[in-house]
Amino acid sequence: MKPAELKRLYRIVKVQLEYGLDELLPEHHLTRAPLLARKSLFWLRNQHADKALGDRLRLALQELGPVWIKFGQMMSTRRDLFPPHIADPLAMLQDKVAPFDGLQAKQLIEEELGAPLETWFDDFDIKPLASASIAQVHTAKLKSNGRDVVLKVIRPDIRPQIDADIKLMYRVARIVAKALPEARRLKPVEVVREYEKTLLDELDLRREAANAIQLRRNFENSEELYVPEVLTDFCNETVMVSERIYGIQVSDLAGLHANGTNMKLLAERGVSVFFTQVFRDSFFHADMHPGNVFVNPNHPENPQWIGLDCGIVGTLNSEDKRYLAENFLAFFNRDYRRVAQLHVDSGWVPLDTNVDEFEVAIRMVCEPIFAKPLCEISFGHVLLNLFNTARRFNMEVQPQLVLLQKTLLYVEGLGRQLYPQLDLWQTAKPFLEKWMANQVGPQAFLHALKERAPLWFEKMPELPELLYDSLKQGRNLNQRLDNLYQGYRQSKRQQGTGKFLFGVGATLVVCSAIWISNQLEPLAIGSATIGVLCWLLSWRAYRQ
């Protein structure tokens, strides 16, 4: 390790010990040495013994800085790996850090755009509107039309810091995976790899711009969701410019009530927006925490959601969507056999899974949920319970489903915060049933025909050539198969000859032994010679 890495590692260990995180080390013969070393560091005692372990972990990550804050946020979404007393406090981590100098931000933007800001913008505010671990946001006006915009710029020198901390995370994850068999279930290296990908994706604002453009297109002219316009002429890897919006933060309940917002409709529209993104578009905003969601103050009787920060999105393929919809419907119909079979059919659990045992396990976990009224049942926790049960049957981690479950928990939490009586099932069931109905029957056939017809017509002129190639390949394949079959038959014949000669040779050798005992040496020698010759011919036949 380099001196800088050792210094950073000491800082990380120091913070962990000051928050008593050595409690996370399991009782194991391999952890005795670290625990003994910990006792020798008498000056690094747990200074927060009055706090719960989950809260101490949250505070430690917050003190270690941006990379670790985001890592904690990701850990909070992996409830299939971490228990509630760890995941719940981590969900409260706030990605807010001190801003860097606004003049430096202005200089960075000018370097990326290749000219002074005054060329395109007026009233650039040196004071940032918001500051997070990866980027910060400033406001300005477009010189051409006076339109209010926001300029998002990646923090300077953030990449080396991320690379250094990720490298240390990998080192620790590999040590933990090798040294502690109990920790392998958590797949520490895979968790770090998933986090690294998420973090590096957020460093490229072109990706966020593309996501925002796609989401805006999907909800164009929609009364339910508005996505600010991205000004692509001013976007690159480290700078993104978009329309500035004025709204009420979704967590500001007092402000929403003061504006006369229809809270019931707003909550129901949040559910509708989520299921529309998932099942209609197969493309959903996967970071819908309250800081990224606002409400349009205009027309409060017909409220509209506003979605910001599209850095993290999720996608589902058609098979995942179908299995997910059928899982929800089967669960709420209490058809646990169907739920178990769907997990096997989808490939989420191994094909050799005992469906009967899996059904019993799902029933034991899910049946108590129905002790509550349907309106109190959490969709997100239903998914969580299903995934946790499936993990016992070797279900592989499905990243797209983890993102979906996290987003569903956000949307559901926001919806019930806005309108506690929100019946998520009554809101979602018609949507799911309608979507499933569109996947089967004449309407689904016509839809599939409509989608594929242009491709078929495009390929029709190539059909004769494709048919000729297929026939030619078929003839060549038949010839190769015939040659293989003839070779197989010849091999079988040779093996049969070899077996026959081996048997004759063995018989003659036995006979030679009998004739020797009866003083018939000439016959014995001749018989043995012919027997050995038969064995040699048999060996030759097998070799061929």
From Swiss-Prot:
Q: What is its main location?
A: membrane
An MF annotation (GO) of this entry = ATP binding
Using the UniProt record, name the top-level EC class of this enzyme in a single word.
transferase
Subcellular location(s) per record: Cell inner membrane
Which parts of the sequence belong to the Protein kinase domain?
123-501
The active site is formed by D287
Where exactly are the transmembrane stretches of this chain?
496-516, 519-539
Annotated EC: 2.7.-.-
Q: Which SUPFAM superfamilies match?
A: Protein kinase-like (PK-like)
Q: Which pathway, per its entry? A: Cofactor biosynthesis; ubiquinone biosynthesis [regulation]
Q: How does the UniProt record describe the way this protein sits in the membrane?
A: Multi-pass membrane protein
Query: What protein family is recorded?
Result: Belongs to the ABC1 family. UbiB subfamily.
Q: What does this protein do?
A: Is probably a protein kinase regulator of UbiI activity which is involved in aerobic coenzyme Q (ubiquinone) biosynthesis.
What is this protein identified as?
Probable protein kinase UbiB
